[in-house]
């Protein structure tokens, strides 16, 4: 069981690192923060607590994906739709 959790944690770290490439404050900032969070929890041994932390990490992944999707949507909307409420 410990090996499966370890693999899951490593996979989560790898996926978060990949998603952090486009983080608004920069990839270096994201990588540093991610590493600090994982190092802070490296001594957790309780499988239930580890599962809880993994779920929190998955939630963060979903939030990042939503952030990127929204940013792309806003950029496309700005390019293709003019704001009719603007006054000149």
UniProtKB/Swiss-Prot annotation:
GO terms for cellular component: mitochondrion. CDD domains: Complex1_LYR_ETFRF1_LYRM5. Keywords: Mitochondrion. GO terms for biological process: negative regulation of oxidative phosphorylation; respiratory electron transport chain. The keyword Mitochondrion applies. The keyword Lyase does not apply. This is Electron transfer flavoprotein regulatory factor 1. It comes from Bos taurus. The lineage of its organism: Eukaryota, Metazoa, Chordata, Craniata, Vertebrata. The gene is ETFRF1.
